[in-house]
Amino acid sequence: MIKKPDKKTLRQGKHKRVRRKVAGTGERPRLCIFKSLHHIYAQIIDDEKGVTLVAASTLEEGLKGLESKTNIAAAQEVGANIAERAREKGIIEVVFDRNGYKYHGSVAALANAAREKGLVF
């Protein structure tokens, strides 16, 4: 009997398809997000060098007081933090890699918060 693939497998397949086309450069690095069951992570990556330039997550000391670390409010804080750190390093334009997740909820909140703080994508 054919089993229906689970959500994680489907997301990973989407991510592989997207990564064939989306790559970060030195001038326009890739803003990649990851959601675990308990936290949200974002990092800006230069794929040509294979280096993470800036990172932010809900594991940081400043976000310890949040009630939930996976909801929209937490995603907005992570988006604002990543944008501020990117601007400090001189990064203004990025390519948004949603990592196979739907552009909805915490993913959209993170992206909108980063845009409000000055990142262009």
From Swiss-Prot:
UniProt keyword list: Ribonucleoprotein, Ribosomal protein, RNA-binding, rRNA-binding
Keyword flag Chloroplast: no
GO terms assigned for molecular function: 5S rRNA binding; structural constituent of ribosome
Taxonomically, the superkingdom here is Bacteria
Database matches in InterPro entries: Ribosomal_uL18_bac-type, Ribosomal_uL18_bac/euk
Q: Which CDD domains match?
A: Ribosomal_L18_L5e
Bias kind Basic residues: ranges: 1-22
Q: Which residues form the signal peptide?
A: none
Positions of disulphide bridges: none
GO BP annotations, alphabetical order: translation
**Gene3D superfamilies, A to Z:** 3.30.420.100
Got a GO cellular component term for this one? cytosolic large ribosomal subunit
Q: Where is this region: Disordered?
A: 1-23
* Binding partners and assembly: Part of the 50S ribosomal subunit; part of the 5S rRNA/L5/L18/L25 subcomplex. Contacts the 5S and 23S rRNAs.
* Function as written in the Swiss-Prot or TrEMBL entry: This is one of the proteins that bind and probably mediate the attachment of the 5S RNA into the large ribosomal subunit, where it forms part of the central protuberance.
Per the record, the similarity remark reads:
Belongs to the universal ribosomal protein uL18 family.
What is the name of this protein? Large ribosomal subunit protein uL18
Tell me which species this is from: Syntrophomonas wolfei subsp. wolfei (strain DSM 2245B / Goettingen)
User: What would be the name of the gene that encodes this protein?
Assistant: rplR
